[in-house]
Amino acid sequence: MLSRRRGVNTTMTTINHTPAGEQGGKKRLIHRFSWVSLLVCWLIWVLNAYDREMILRLGPVISKEFSLSPEQWGNVVALIMVALAVLDIPGSIWSDRYGSGWKRARFQVPLVLGYTALSFLSGIKAISHGLTAFVLLRVGVNLGAGWGEPVGVSNTAEWWPKEKRGFALGVHHTGYPIGALLSGVVASLVLATFGEGSWRYCFLLALIVAIPLMIFWAKYSTADRINTLYLHIDSQGMTRPATQESSHVAKGEGMKTFLRTLRNRNISLTAGNTLLTQIVYMGINVVLPPYLYHVSGLSLAASAGLSIIFTLTGTLGQIIWPWLSDSFGRKRTLIVCGLWMSIGIALFYFATNMPRLIAIQLFFGLVANAVWPIYYAMASDSAEERATSTANGIITTAMFIGGGISPLLMGWLIQFGGGWENPAGYIYAFFTMAGCALLGMLLQLMTTDKTPRKAH
């Protein structure tokens, strides 16, 4: 009834095939529904990143409390991080079966509330006082957080025209460096204010923010709104993200759709690059806090705070590079970013004083976070329309497998180099990460660009 009063067509409408170029002289406007959905999905991503990254900021103090060696800490982090990969593909298939567009948000709400509630429990010492209990709770958190990533990415893409997909996913993914930055700031404040024994307080925040946010999102995401949005996209001469306001993968077709998507060369090669890049990104997060504490001699609070400097330029990079990929092309942008990342991580060899450490972090940060939305845009551009979340789930799974490998590898390299106090292991880690970034760039060279070209 509401949609009829507003004059909105409630039936599923087909795409307007008017070429975008025919409206080339008209300024294309983005509907407010796109901006509101982007803000909500961005805030969800900030919470996801904050919660996921916090354990890395707290690495030295957790290792100290439970008397963990570098290799033992690497094993703990690997177990927690590999949980991010477990439910991505089955969860994405389930999400695609439930429905795309406005229905996707209804799927997202209980998921976000569930994993932030588990995180809250891990912040209560009476529940998580032992290492086993704490690790099991964090594994539960990451099962949900990993599942939520491709769902959130797909949700963002389905509220924006295809020509602006790179920009939208880039802005969405600025939530990750912001969340990572907040994790360092909050960890530093908690440790400095309450002492190192109160580090669990850091895990209480996410649920408090998530509850009102998800109540709003459940009410906001409706068929009427997204249908109005798609009609507006048609009127602006741009391409809808989907031909109808909601579609789904039919029952019994999920595995067939997944296998077709996995066989897509663009998606599988981009997933390989994603895995290697995540070894780099997770590696620098695992390595920097103990490097600053054990080698540079900073306090626990200072090492947590100064290990996230690269997120300052990471936010800027996540807007510029994905936006540039809309016109320059996803493939070429990823190749440039891969080479930049390899050089940036190798430069940590020269980070022998604080000014150099800060400068190198800022240089590395310009691409450290930028590549993820471009990977998702590449997968979304190459996927079947109804299988967007499945394609993004493959990317996410590859990413989190890399995230599980990375702490094992970094812990072993630090141990091999002589342990926490010896700089040699950290140098081995930096050059190993540089090689991974370079190898990922070579994989991307073998893909074909599917970027929509009528973005301007």
Regions found by a protein language model. Give the residues of each.
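C-terminal ends and interior cores of transmembrane alpha-helices
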Residues: 113-128, 339-352
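C-terminal membrane-cytosol helix-exit motif in multi-pass small-molecule transporters
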Residues: 207-237, 440-448
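Cytoplasmic helix-loop-helix junction between adjacent transmembrane helices
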Residues: 137-174
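Extracytoplasmic gate region of multi-pass secondary transporters
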Residues: 55-56, 264-315, 406-407
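C-terminal transmembrane helical hairpin of 12-TM major facilitator-type secondary transporters
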Residues: 325, 330-378
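Helix-loop-helix hairpin linking two adjacent transmembrane segments in secondary transporters
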Residues: 172-225
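Cytoplasmic membrane-interface "Motif A"-like loop-to-helix N-cap segments
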Residues: 97-112, 327-338
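Central cavity-lining transmembrane alpha-helices of secondary-active solute carriers
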Residues: 78-93, 308-320
